[in-house]
A protein has these predicted regions:
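Glycine-centered positions within short beta-strands or beta-hairpins
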Residues: 18-24
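Short, surface-exposed, charged amphipathic helix/loop patches that serve as local interaction elements
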Residues: 2-13, 25-103
Length: 103
């Protein structure tokens, strides 16, 4: 059974490099992280798809901020927004896709 998946295995944090050239860690996506993302964004993940359709950039910035806030609580949302260019948005799209897959 080589393809067996260990559902208890801990997911490793990911890192992204933002426009300031610094590497930032993204937390593993677990229940606490997801709950904190909802709290930070002010809406449940069930509304994420419609929010992305209606307010794409605002919602993307909120997701990225919520993720970074887990590891870097000193960042504020405007600061995070200034650190994100289209290049950075594409580099974290996989993580955002993982979150959306759960909704």
């Amino acid at each position: 059974m080589e393809n067996e998946v260990n559902i208890l295995a801990e997911e490793k944090p990911k890192s992204i490099t933002l426009s300031d050239g610094k590497e930032y860690k993204l937390p593993p996506i677990d229940m606490t992280t997801l709950a904190n993302i909802e709290k930070t964004m002010g809406f449940g993940l069930g509304k994420l798809q419609s929010k992305l359709e209606d307010e794409t950039i605002t919602t993307m910035r909120s997701i990225i901020y919520a993720l970074l806030k887990e590891v870097q609580p000193d960042l504020d949302i405007d600061e995070v927004g200034h650190l994100i260019t289209l290049k950075e948005m594409s580099s974290i799209s996989e993580t955002i896709s993982e979150i959306m897959a759960l909704t």
